[in-house]
Amino acid sequence: VAFHVVGGGLAGLSAAVALASAPGGHDVVLHEAAPRAGGRCRSWHDTELDVEIDNGTHALLGANPQALAYLARIGAEDRVHWLDGGIEFLDLRDGARWSIRGPADMLRPWRHGGSGAAREMALLLRLLVPGQGAAVPPGLAGATGLGRLAWDPLVRSIMNTAPGIAAAVPFAAALRRILRGGARGMRVGLARRSLADCLVDPALHLLARHGARLRLGARLREVRGGADGAPPVLHFDGEAVELARHDRAILALPPWDLARCAPGLAPDCAASPIVNLHAVLDMPDTGAGDIAFRGLVGGQVEWVLRRGRVASSTTSAAEALSGLSRAELHARLWPDMARALGLPPGARALRWRTIVERRATPVQDASFEACRPGIATAAANVLLAGDWVVPGLPCTIEAAIASGVAAADAALRSARTARE
């Protein structure tokens, strides 16, 4: 039995790891179009900055059971730095500072009562059990009360879609899990060195130990067959892989890439961008263990992560910024980053660059949520994985890993049935 996983992002990596680790030993091949694995969680040595950077400031939460299980499976638990003091926030409008360590801190504004607090409580209660097709109420992202505390960056970072547009069902699922987890569920975990060092390289080492094959630069061009009993054929550059009756393929690709090579398997969905600013600071290199993380409200930047002298910012649902030039982006983002880092007015970075991930996720509105396909396809030996696949979960690291594990489990079960 051969298992072909197409796509080396976290969905594909988690699927390949689950397949390679399963009892009995299996022939697992991971095909990735890029020169490195990792997808949107990749890391690389940037020649402009002369340092290693990540493709964004991705973070884990204590309320991410699938991600935590993945870390344990690949032996990377010690590569995560957990913030013990909660999430620090800064309001760029008036300099107010606060931290959120658990659900009680998120509810702090309501202790003071008033009509605004009562309105926000009603909105939150309605959000926790939303109707199908509902959007996250924009009132939770206002300039006062709970909206000021955390909701706007929380909605945008989880959904990469603005409040008022973001589908309420997946956001509510993530929110319920966070609230149920208490203070432990809200702990933030950050890669100590890089996303690749934490989430990608240990998985590749596990796959190599189990004899799995990694094919980099292997772009899937087309999927033929699979209907009316015809065997599916995966067409890569210069190679075609025909799936035998008991073989299985997991297509762990973004929806726009899947739509290109296998029309009909992915919904037609708009993309939502994320903008990052990376900067090398004028300070001594204090090493990978020196990590700071802060949320911002009232500005252009939502999150700032600093590892040693390398700082990175994230702005989600960044349609308004994605068309700007590098210089314009720097002019908008650097002042926010500098304030978050406590730098003096007029401070400059030694080197900087901006990165616009134009297709970071789909726009996660109600119409997208309604057409997510799930992992099964019409062909018994072709399955799907990806953060966008499974209904009811936001497009996050947790969803990507969960979909990969679910697809691997389904592939193992169906392959076993086909052999019997």
What are these regions (language model features)?
Residues 43-45, 101-104, 303-420:
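Conserved flavin/dinucleotide-binding core of flavoenzymes
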